[in-house]
Amino acid sequence: MHIPDNYLSPQTDAVMAVAMVPVWVHCIKKVRATLDREHMAFLGICAAFSFLLMMFNVPLPGGTTGHAVGGALIALLLGPEAAAIAVSVALALQALLFGDGGVLSFGANCFNMAFVLPFAAAIVFRALNSRLHDKSWGTPVSAIVSGWVGLCLAALCAAIEFGIQPMLFTNASGAPLYCPFPLSVAIPAMLIPHMLVAGVVEGVATAAIYGFIKKTAPSVIVGPEAVDGQLAAEGAAAKKTSLVPTLILVAVLVVATPLGLLATGDAWGEWDAEGAATAVQEAGDDSLQASVGLDTPTFADALPTGDYLQAYSEEQGLGFAGQAAMYILSGVIGVAVLTIAFRLISLTVKENGAHGDGRAA
């Protein structure tokens, strides 16, 4: 779901970036007003969860791959505004340091994964959990459904962004300048696999990690359950809370990241030039195949050659062990950068934040 540069027009990139500005402004104000120093530092751990979950690629129907995002998880832990900030920072790190996702398309990727996903998940979770929280299975089911809905809506938004490109941007001969797949192709190609697999992974990961943190460190949760008073008794009963189990979980995820290498194939809409040409040819549509002609400056001619780690691994001829080591190293770097960055930011926040009625919505 990381849209690379050149798949969307500069105009689309600009519109999506502008659309995210008020979202970021609102979320920053909300987070600074509601999170104290402890929770601001914990937000860095949450951003690390998002960064790591996006490294676990899973095979999807059709031979493509996908991944969870973690936006729903953070929305349940700290609220959707905090999730928007955490996922945005994780996406920026991936784009700038690892070449995963475009720089120009950063606004679009944030709109889909840092805005639509966590806010939709928070709305769904509150609607379901308000009715089911008194049942032992209520909160886990609410978390699974909220994660599934959030990721599927994010995938739908990405599909629409892909699909409108050939409608709006073509060259003199009528060939698409950017993503050549129309809505009739992009929506089912993106939405169905995410509904069947990736959305389920997002939901299960959300429920599992949220339940784990709820048992080991309930005091850090200030999301929808806390706002709605559904955590009051549990929080009061927890005399001691520790982030050590959570940090151990982060370490386990870092070591396990090479599992993401087992899923072969590119994510739909994240091909390099060669992969894009192959995808167009496999579509069996002559008008689409015209968009990759060598005699015109079409979208495929300007596409990146893949993420930095993949390119380096191929250049060095690394085997699975070498690629696994690179993957773990990138996970360590990502987690370190995110936790240190938010720890430094937390130093600018007051020791005791306002966690009353103004907590995450």
Predicted regions and their residues:
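Individual transmembrane alpha-helix segments
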Residues: 1, 297-343
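Hydrophobic core segments of alpha-helical transmembrane domains in multi-pass membrane transport
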Residues: 16-29, 49-54, 119-122, 147-162, ...
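Alpha-helical membrane segments and adjacent membrane-interface helices in multi-pass membrane proteins
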Residues: 54-121
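Short helix-perturbing small/polar motifs within transmembrane alpha-helices
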Residues: 114-158
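Membrane-water interface at loop-to-transmembrane-helix junctions
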Residues: 141, 145, 189-193, 227-250
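Juxtamembrane interface at the cytosolic side of transmembrane helices
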Residues: 225, 338-361
